[in-house]
Amino acid sequence: MSLSPTAEAIKHYKVTFNWKNGFESWSKVPTTENYHMLAPNLGLEATGADEIRDIIFGFCTENELQQELTDIIEHGQYVTCMLNLKTKSGESLQCVEVFLLDDEGRVDKIWAL
């Protein structure tokens, strides 16, 4: 099954992720103006590009986060990524990110679980 243009952009971002230029790469994915991200297990929440850059990508930079995309699934307005994550301290964890797209195919909400 083929992915929508936004899901393909998310996939490209995840496959090529590098904490040094994470936000720059992410900014190529279409988003709404006030898109929202919640990562409850990490205690992170942000709304809009500036907060996403400062809070979410600040965390990625501080931890030199590495991501490995193991699968991506699109189901209606949802894009789900299964990831293996690793921090600079060597901590490894599995994560699922769910992206909710609006009617125009832009990312509106992100849950990192």
Specify the residue positions occupied by each region the protein language model found.
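Alpha-helix initiation/capping motif
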Residues: 1-2, 45
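Short acidic-aromatic low-complexity motifs
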Residues: 2-33
